[in-house]
Amino acid sequence: MAKILIVDDEDNIRLFYSEELRDEGYEVVTAEDGYELIDKIRSDSPDLIILDIKMTGYNGLDLLQEIRREFYDLPVILCSAYSSYKDEGKSISANAYVVKSSDLTDLKKKVKRSLEENIPAPE
């Protein structure tokens, strides 16, 4: 099954997303900040990343640009509590964007679609 890397500075979000995605049959690894992110990509070889935009000390949009420099084809889904980042995420090559919610239906659909189609990053 596909491996998903969840990057979020909130423990409860990482735990909630991890449990829900494991229930869907995915293998899940987590990172709590940008320091861990690139190391986790190299060590765990995820098939997809779910990346929080607003983390303490980090901007997920900047991290996405860093990911794209080295791992251009790795699907990345941005997530935020704010819908205002959607257009900005698309403009810097996110594969999808979701607003954080206790209902993960949208996230699960976008994870499945991104993995099945291996959607390349927009140019």
What are these regions, as identified by a protein language model?
Residues 14, 56:
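The feature encodes the CheY-like receiver
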Residues 15-23:
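Charged docking surfaces used in two-component/phosphorelay signaling
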Residues 30-48:
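Acidic, metal-coordinating helix/loop segments flanking the phosphotransfer/catalytic sites
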Residues 33, 59-62:
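Acidic catalytic/metal-coordinating carboxylates
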Residues 39, 61-71:
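Short amphipathic alpha-helix used as the core "switch/output" element in two-component signaling
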Residues 52:
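Active-site residues of response regulator receiver
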Residues 62, 83-109:
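Alpha4 helix (beta4-alpha4-beta5 surface) of REC/receiver domains from two-component response regulators
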